[in-house]
């Protein structure tokens, strides 16, 4: 009897587990139909370019048969060649690989600017293996988008979706050519929306965990309705490979750029002229703000619309042109959608009060110099500081501050300060000398958090600084 009871229990448990597995499987999306419908409008893009190349020096590492593609990968994601890659220059041919997709029946193709940047010839290969030499209609390096045109008719096209409707947790799918493997399909979820990256602050990126690798760039990101909601652009990595964090340009941003490229061959956008950062809870507290939102100005560029309007470093922009700023990444996009010579109101928080400042926007310069930088380290409070060397100040456009020459631990270390940071402001007061820095720091009570402005590796930012006992 006991034996029979055990067998019955095993059957019941097995049935329950099987039912649970089937229910779970049924709840997962089936991408088959989506891929079949969307793939014909996805293209493979390859380029030819005559370049001056470098070979590995003594002790340099060899990267194998696909070294050129890997070199491009390192260059795009890290801004430099792999370690050891220096040698006498040689003339040669370089090819790059990427993805794209067809947005009109008469042959307009959208991809990333970095996929075709500097190319002499651009090849577009369709799903049915037809191949065309594409004409470059225009590019927008600030959003990393490029519009191509191939001479063909009745082409399959993608359906464009509304990226504003995307929410974290929704399924998304990518089709592209990672490492040259055509029409590779990967899927994942939206991790976040509105991500602002330091080098691309005109794009509120879609962050996903979809596997993206070299060759995926420029390819479409689909929602479950088969609509393109993003253009896969870049990844975050410490290993050189995919680590679960990838970024896509929202379709809304892309189509705005496409419209201008089609009509003018270039993109014009308004310019405010500030460097900004998010306001976290500690910064909000240190500024006396009752909520952690807005865009904190860390630097006002010389002769910019912001400077002319009277905006200052340390101002927190709460609203711009009537639109609330929840986080700093929203401001560049709002400004970028506006036209030069538009006059707008900015609601800012300054010295514990809200005020409205009128700003007249201007056309963005082709190459505004927005970067300052830093190198060494500082004094007291767990650090040794020194005067900023004249050559450093001139080179990086630093007009005041002290440089951290050494972090000793304690307060400096706990506040995240690093050797090479340049401290330009503390508790709302400009730092002009080592003595002045020590005096201002001495007047700050222990345990109280105050705003500190630092320049780190060329990027200015505010941090909440708290003196530890």
UniProtKB/Swiss-Prot annotation:
Recorded hits in InterPro entries, A to Z, give:
PDZ, PDZ_6, PDZ_sf, Pept_S1C_Do, Peptidase_S1_PA, Peptidase_S1C
Q: What biological process terms from GO does the record include? A: proteolysis
Binding positions for substrate per the UniProt entry? 215-217, 272-276
Q: Which UniProt keywords apply?
A: Hydrolase, Periplasm, Protease, Repeat, Serine protease, Signal, Stress response
* Single GO cellular component term: periplasmic space
Q: Which sites are catalytic?
A: 114 (charge relay system), 144 (charge relay system), 217 (charge relay system)
Record-listed E.C. numbers: 3.4.21.107
Organism superkingdom: Bacteria
Q: Which residues form the PDZ domain?
A: 261-352, 358-458
What compartments host this protein?
A: Periplasm
Provide the catalytic activity annotation.
Acts on substrates that are at least partially unfolded. The cleavage site P1 residue is normally between a pair of hydrophobic residues, such as Val-|-Val
Q: Which GO terms describe its molecular function?
A: serine-type endopeptidase activity
The residues forming the signal peptide are 1-25
Q: What does this protein do?
A: Might be efficient in the degradation of transiently denatured and unfolded proteins which accumulate in the periplasm following stress conditions.
What protein family is recorded? Belongs to the peptidase S1C family.
What is the protein's name according to its record?
A: Probable periplasmic serine endoprotease DegP-like
Species per Swiss-Prot/TrEMBL record: Marinomonas sp. (strain MWYL1)
Lineage, please?
Answer: Bacteria, Pseudomonadati, Pseudomonadota, Gammaproteobacteria, Oceanospirillales
